[in-house]
Amino acid sequence: MKWRSTTVVCVRKNDSVVMVSDGQVTYGNTIMKGNAKKVRKMGEGNVLAGFAGSVADAMALFDRFEAKYREWGGNLLKSAVELAKDWRTDRVLRRLEALLLVADKKYTFIISGTGEVIQPEDDIASIGSGSPYAIAAGRALLKHTNLSAKEIALESIRIASEICIYTNDNFTIEEL
């Protein structure tokens, strides 16, 4: 059986950075849990981080990312690149199945196990199975409304939760 994914969304607008995730954990065709916390603050509250994929793998990556963040003196870009390099080259890390979404006041990055560190070209990023729906909704809301970052993030993931069967409407919100 396969663990199915989730949806995590990050929206930047004005001086606000908001990350929201759903709470559903799905194994095969069964919902195992509906209130998992998939986003958190790290780096003394200066960084938001969320994950999609295997929970145990993501926790290991959270810990590694936080160590890299401390090692590089709070430089999010360098921390993301160094984690991606380790993730790609280390035999044990290479087997971890998760994606990380990290953001601070300046940057947002998606970090993958294949070595990618992707900075979105606009002010919204998303990972997980509901990501395409959340991105589409978020881009439209950013472009055509005056909603806040928090309102856009929540509406984007709410729309994704109505379409993606691996995403529920039990949201966790973190803000910078």
UniProtKB/Swiss-Prot annotation:
Family to which this protein belongs: Belongs to the peptidase T1B family. HslV subfamily.
Catalytic activity reported: ATP-dependent cleavage of peptide bonds with broad specificity
Family matches, as Pfam families: Proteasome (PF00227)
Record's protein name: ATP-dependent protease subunit HslV
MF terms (GO), sorted A to Z: metal ion binding; threonine-type endopeptidase activity
Annotated EC: 3.4.25.2
Location within or outside the cell: Cytoplasm
GO cellular component: HslUV protease complex; proteasome core complex
InterPro entries recorded: ATP-dep_Prtase_HsIV_su, Ntn_hydrolases_N, Proteasome_sua/b, Proteasome_suB-type
Enzyme's top EC category: hydrolase
Role noted for this protein: Protease subunit of a proteasome-like degradation complex believed to be a general protein degrading machinery.
UniProt KW Hydrolase keyword: yes
Species this chain originates from: Thermosipho melanesiensis (strain DSM 12029 / CIP 104789 / BI429)
List of residues binding Na(+): S161, C164, T167
